Amino acid sequence: MKRILTISAIVFLAAAVAMPGIANAQDNAWHQKDQVLSAGVGFGMYGLYGSSTLPPIFVAFETGVAEKITLGGLVAYSGSSDDFGYGKWKYTYIVISARGAYHFLEHQPKFDAYAGAGLGYDIVSASVTWNNPGFEAQFGRFYSASASYFFFDVFLGGRYYFSPKWALLGEVGYGVGFARIGVSYKLN
């Protein structure tokens, strides 16, 4: 799966570089003062347990701080559950991440390609609800645990602007899902 996503990302970026460009810098898809809000879904998040899984749903914001550099943040939520006969585990993941990216294509009016990194914090909680009254009497109605950790996010992505403000988003990397798709909207 990771191999397919990596090959897809390389083909996607190679096609964008090969597209004929317009020599006017104003026609770039990304500008220094741009502010972009994105939302979407991730696939293949590390650490998800259970037979029923909600993939990571994310919202991200980024703003230009230099000609090709952006800084921003991302918040994501994911959950899963596992029914094991005498009870049901429920896992919840809340991710908060700071990100930075370098936008490396020029003279592409509809395509924005970038690579970046981030540092995030994953808040993980787990709880169990017992199906067996004997377990409930022995352990209590609920049993819960939590564990949170920092993680490093590395990503390669691109946006295809199908209008001046709206774009389709695709990213591959490690952090909030091995692959992410969504939509982006330029706020300015």
Q: In which residue ranges do the predicted regions lie?
A:
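Cleavable N-terminal export/targeting peptides
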Residues: 1-33
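Short hydrophobic/aromatic segments of transmembrane alpha-helices and their interfaces
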Residues: 6-8, 52-53, 150-151
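Short glycine/proline- and aromatic-enriched beta-strand/turn motifs that initiate or cap beta-hairpins
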Residues: 21-63, 103, 175, 182-188
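Gram-negative (and chloroplast) outer-membrane scaffold detector with strong preference
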Residues: 36, 43, 55-134, 160-162, ...
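Extracellular loop and loop/strand-boundary signature of outer-membrane beta-barrel proteins
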Residues: 44-46, 83-89, 139-144, 167-169
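Gram-negative outer-membrane beta-barrel domains
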Residues: 62, 102-112, 122-124, 141-188
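Solvent-exposed loop segments that connect transmembrane elements
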Residues: 129-145
